[in-house]
């Protein structure tokens, strides 16, 4: 743990009874320190040496310059109930990041696993509660925070950072970290534990399994390799209690399409019109590389029939007219 008092603090909302599978009332607000980490010894022991007997939930995000296959990881944010840790990948270097384990794949060779993606969870809850599935992109983090079912707050500071990033894509590479950088990095994770518990209280057994399964597929989008993920943990099996009269929920697959040079524009279309039309025609998630992985690939997640349909439509767009 960090032994030097931190000059930074922030407010973290936490549920009153996080272990109960019931709607969560008003959150309790705690003042917690923000630690800037440059050495693994500054991190909690239960994080560095995890135990299967004592599982912990951590809010996780990362910042960097062009974060994808060839980008540079600059900061990893870790939210615990009693503190927020900003792991400085630039000052701490490769040894620090490898000690943390849940980092990014291409820069440090570390796989993502056991990740609860709040965007996926939000989408599954919307479907579970009978709302129409959107063919557009997942809800933004700002939109999630604004939803009164989760936090119901505005995050105006996020737009300020976005403007700075558009002006200077190397914003997160500069050192020492400014107060704005520290605040912005902490704000991206300080609500995650509360949102996590709110979502877990809403998910039923079926959507919880889909969250685990779909989340595992999404992690593979970040970490494309040449061995078809043979060295990855197995995908979560269907629980016995979801098998009714011998029928199990339809499993989903991940398909990765390589896009020839100059063809991505044909897939996306003017102002995204083409890719949106394909999404509306298929009951599958279609992700363009970049933020989700290599920029020359398209990722399709869904039931086999819908994935094959999306593949055919996308390949058709890539053909020379």
Model-flagged regions — what are they?
Residues 34, 83, 296-302:
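Short cationic amphipathic helices and targeting signals
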Residues 58-59, 77, 86, 258, ...:
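Beta-strand cores of modular interaction/reader domains in eukaryotic scaffold and signaling proteins
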Residues 72, 292-299:
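The conserved glycine-aromatic submotif of the RRM
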Residues 282-294, 318-319:
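Polar interaction faces of repeat-based domains
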Residues 30-202:
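Conserved DEDDh/DEDDy metal-dependent 3′-5′ exonuclease domain
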Residues 197, 202-266, 273-280, 301:
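Acidic catalytic cores of enzymes that act on phosphate-bearing nucleotides/polynucleotides
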Residues 299, 303-321:
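Charge-rich, low-aromatic oligomerization/scaffolding segments with amphipathic character
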Residues 1-58, 220:
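N-terminal accessory regions of nucleic-acid-interacting proteins
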